[in-house]
From Swiss-Prot:
Binding site for D-glyceraldehyde 3-phosphate: S151, C152, T153, T182, R197, T210, G211, R233
Function: Catalyzes the oxidative phosphorylation of glyceraldehyde 3-phosphate (G3P) to 1,3-bisphosphoglycerate (BPG) using the cofactor NAD. The first reaction step involves the formation of a hemiacetal intermediate between G3P and a cysteine residue, and this hemiacetal intermediate is then oxidized to a thioester, with concomitant reduction of NAD to NADH. The reduced NADH is then exchanged with the second NAD, and the thioester is attacked by a nucleophilic inorganic phosphate to produce BPG.
Annotated protein name in UniProt: Glyceraldehyde-3-phosphate dehydrogenase
Active site: C152 (nucleophile)
A Pfam family that the UniProt record links to this protein: Gp_dh_C
Compartment list: Cytoplasm
Annotated source species: Thermotoga maritima (strain ATCC 43589 / DSM 3109 / JCM 10099 / NBRC 100826 / MSB8)
Main localization of the protein described in the UniProt heading: cytoplasm
A GO molecular function held by the record: glyceraldehyde-3-phosphate dehydrogenase (NAD+) (phosphorylating) activity
Secretion signal span: none
Gene coding for it: gap
GO cellular component: cytoplasm
Subunit annotation: Homotetramer.
Residue(s) at site: Activates thiol group during catalysis: H179
Length: 333
């Protein structure tokens, strides 16, 4: 039985817990949560979700714990991870989902506290490995202690990049993620170090940065230096789409690109990348468990070598499923 703690019970932390609850894997037990607020608030936010709706179990709380279906989960509000009682609680894995402890030095604070491994739900620095399932999960090793799951956007497109590069050879490319707003934006016009993210999230189209394109090269090293991109934040709470345009070496057609991707989604990427051939919109993919859903209706090819593809993704729930998948892979080692 793996004992798991979740550090940061925000959008991703709560969904990771929900997915663990839904899967009912007998080998995983969430024993602790650390977040800088009170248990009443955490219980309410777990129970009610504006996007993913009401939690499927019974949620109660005490001063120092959450109680889900009668099972107690210890709750802490400690800003310094090195002071958390991971050793006393026998914590094997920490899901690091604060967005704060993203480099090796900070993530190691959990190890100092007694945890055995840390899974970071964001791009990281100094990690042992960045894992995107569908690309390089076979490189996970038992000795890895600090693991990054990259970003939701990287997960949405990297497996597709890998397939396209293997089949057609990517020369260069640009991606744009049209991304729902997140809590790293302001609800109203208020200060932010990114002056565009300082503007009201629900009433603006907001161009900003993404490291997703360059991060793809961490898991598909063959395209290192060949991709870049940007993000456009839009006034939706969840559901995003990554638009990728690449120049390829081998001439192709729309039909061939779609056939190659359909084969991949039914084979090695089954359950990771979905395939769509209907005129869907973003709300249609909320609650889907895929890292991305390849949209065959959007595929375009000009001159045989300029290829555009698109991948829908639930940037919260789909990504959180991959985090739990990564945890389950580590359990088997």
């Amino acid at each position: 039985m793996a004992r798991v703690a979740i550090n940061g019970f925000g959008r991703i932390g709560r969904l990771v817990y929900r997915i663990i609850y839904e899967r009912k894997n007998p080998d995983i037990e969430v024993v602790a949560i650390n977040d800088l607020t009170d248990t009443k608030t955490l219980a309410h936010l777990l129970k009610y979700d504006s996007v993913h709706k009401k939690f499927p179990g019974k949620v109660e709380y005490t001063e120092n714990s959450l109680i889900v279906d009668g099972k107690e989960i210890k709750v802490f509000a400690e800003p310094d991870p090195s002071k958390l009682p991971w050793k006393d609680l026998g914590v094997d894995f920490v899901i690091e989902s604060t967005g704060v402890f993203r480099n090796r030095e900070k993530a190691e604070l959990h190890l100092q506290a007694g945890a055995k491994k840390v899974i970071i739900t964001a791009p990281a620095k100094g990690e042992d490995i960045t894992v995107v399932i569908g690309c390089n999960e076979d490189q996970l090793k038992p000795e890895h202690t600090i693991i990054s799951c990259a970003s939701c956007t990287t997960n949405s497109i990297a497996p597709i990049v890998k397939v396209l590069h293997e089949k057609f050879g990517i020369v260069s490319g640009m991606l744009t993620t049209v991304h729902s707003y997140t809590n790293d934006q302001r609800v109203l016009d208020l200060p932010h170090k990114d002056l565009r993210r300082a503007r009201a999230a629900a009433v603006n189209i907001i161009p900003t940065t993404t490291g997703a394109a360059k991060a793809v090269a961490l898991v598909v090293p063959e395209v290192k230096g060949k991709l870049d991109g940007m993000a456009i934040r839009v006034p939706t709470p969840d559901g995003s789409i990554t638009d990728l345009t690449v120049l390829v070496e081998k001439e192709t057609t729309v039909e061939e690109v779609n056939a190659v991707m359909k084969e991949a989604t039914e084979g090695r990427l089954k359950g990771i990348i979905g395939y769509n051939d209907e005129p869907i919109v973003s709300s249609d993919i909320i609650g889907t468990t895929f890292s991305g859903i390849f949209d065959a209706t959007i595929t375009n090819v000009i001159g045989g070598k300029l290829v555009k593809v698109a991948s829908w993704y639930d940037n919260e729930y789909g990504y959180s499923n991959r985090v739990v998948d990564t945890l389950e892979l580590l359990l088997k080692m």
